[in-house]
Amino acid sequence: MSKLSIYVFFFSFSFSFAQDKGIELFNDKKYSEAIEYYKKVLKQRKGDAAAELGLGSSAYYNDNIDLALRSFEEASKSDNEIIQSKALYNIARILQAKDEISKSLKLYKKALELNPSDVDTKINYELLKKMKNQEQQENQDQEGSQEQQ
């Protein structure tokens, strides 16, 4: 599958309920320190979905995709639909990078159902869906031309 660069922010730390120090470390690109900070927060407040989201984002930017995925999966269990939507969006982005397109599309769609006004999710969903449809059309065209030979 051809790669499509989608220029949107991976995660926006605009949650008013997120931890200031973690956001500051993240924004300063001190991802390892942010990871440690969020781990400490989660030891004190297990199940803190905002901290899981912060941990996931910090881990992602620190190239620790496994930790990022686990953290986003935990955050996706939140009762808060905005956090849940952001977590699903981030999982979808990771799966998209792994070429798990069908799973990614399903998660983008679910994130949009939770937060229909999320422009980044809407853009990624539509672009990925278009890319998948174009690829399917190209495959059908190739099969048709091979049959004619």
Identify what each model region corresponds to.
Residues 4-13:
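Sec-dependent N-terminal signal peptides
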Residues 17, 43-44, 51, 79-84, ...:
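Short coil/turn linker motifs that delimit alpha-helical repeat modules in TPR/alpha-solenoid proteins
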Residues 17-44, 61:
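Alpha-helical segment of the N-proximal tetratricopeptide repeat
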Residues 33, 37-40, 54, 71-74:
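Residue-level detector of alpha-helical secondary structure
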Residues 40-62, 115:
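Short, charge-rich amphipathic alpha-helical segments embedded
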Residues 62-149:
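Feature detects intrinsically disordered, low-complexity acidic/polar segments
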